[in-house]
Protein backbone atom coordinates (compact mmCIF):
# COMPACT_ATOMS: atom_id res chain seq x y z
CA UNK A 1 0.00 0.00 0.00
CA UNK A 2 1.24 3.49 -0.84
CA UNK A 3 2.25 5.91 1.88
CA UNK A 4 1.84 9.67 2.17
CA UNK A 5 4.35 12.00 3.81
CA UNK A 6 2.37 14.86 5.40
CA UNK A 7 4.09 18.01 6.73
CA UNK A 8 2.42 20.83 8.65
CA UNK A 9 3.39 24.10 6.94
CA UNK A 10 1.11 26.67 8.59
CA UNK A 11 -0.14 27.24 12.12
CA UNK A 12 -3.56 26.10 13.32
CA UNK A 13 -3.93 29.08 15.69
CA UNK A 14 -6.43 30.97 13.54
CA UNK A 15 -7.91 27.91 11.86
CA UNK A 16 -11.43 26.70 12.54
CA UNK A 17 -11.60 24.29 15.51
CA UNK A 18 -12.59 21.36 13.30
CA UNK A 19 -9.56 21.97 11.08
CA UNK A 20 -7.24 22.10 14.10
CA UNK A 21 -8.76 18.82 15.31
CA UNK A 22 -8.20 17.26 11.88
CA UNK A 23 -4.53 18.29 11.93
CA UNK A 24 -4.17 16.73 15.38
CA UNK A 25 -5.93 13.55 14.20
CA UNK A 26 -3.41 13.28 11.36
CA UNK A 27 -0.71 13.15 14.03
CA UNK A 28 0.72 16.62 13.43
CA UNK A 29 1.56 19.04 16.21
CA UNK A 30 3.99 21.89 15.64
CA UNK A 31 4.86 23.56 12.35
CA UNK A 32 7.37 21.48 10.43
CA UNK A 33 6.38 18.13 11.93
CA UNK A 34 6.11 15.28 9.45
CA UNK A 35 4.21 12.00 9.62
CA UNK A 36 3.73 9.06 7.29
CA UNK A 37 0.19 7.77 6.81
CA UNK A 38 -1.26 5.03 4.64
CA UNK A 39 -2.92 6.27 1.47
CA UNK A 40 -6.63 5.59 1.90
CA UNK A 41 -9.87 7.54 1.31
CA UNK A 42 -10.20 8.55 4.97
CA UNK A 43 -6.74 10.14 5.12
CA UNK A 44 -7.24 11.76 1.70
CA UNK A 45 -10.46 13.36 2.97
CA UNK A 46 -8.70 14.70 6.05
CA UNK A 47 -5.91 16.12 3.88
CA UNK A 48 -8.45 17.76 1.56
CA UNK A 49 -10.05 19.47 4.56
CA UNK A 50 -6.76 21.05 5.68
CA UNK A 51 -4.94 21.25 2.33
CA UNK A 52 -4.13 24.93 2.90
CA UNK A 53 -2.18 24.03 6.07
CA UNK A 54 -0.23 20.95 4.97
CA UNK A 55 2.14 19.74 2.26
CA UNK A 56 1.73 16.18 0.97
CA UNK A 57 4.16 13.90 -0.89
CA UNK A 58 3.64 10.33 -2.09
CA UNK A 59 6.33 7.89 -1.04
Swiss-Prot record:
SUPFAM superfamilies attached to this UniProt entry: Ribosomal protein L30p/L7e
Cellular component per GO, a single term: cytosolic large ribosomal subunit
Molecular function in Gene Ontology: structural constituent of ribosome
Pfam families referenced in this protein's UniProt entry, alphabetically: Ribosomal_L30
InterPro entries: Ribo_uL30_ferredoxin-like_sf, Ribosomal_uL30_bac-type, Ribosomal_uL30_CS, Ribosomal_uL30_ferredoxin-like
Keywords recorded for this protein, A-Z: Ribonucleoprotein, Ribosomal protein
PROSITE patterns registered for this protein in UniProt: RIBOSOMAL_L30 (PS00634)
One biological process term in Gene Ontology: translation
Keyword Ribosomal protein: yes
The protein's assembly and partners: Part of the 50S ribosomal subunit.
UniProt family annotation: Belongs to the universal ribosomal protein uL30 family.
NCBIfam families recorded: rpmD_bact
Protein name: Large ribosomal subunit protein uL30
Native organism: Ruminiclostridium cellulolyticum (strain ATCC 35319 / DSM 5812 / JCM 6584 / H10)
Amino acid sequence: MAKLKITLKKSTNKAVKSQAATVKALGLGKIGTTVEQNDNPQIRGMIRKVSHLVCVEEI
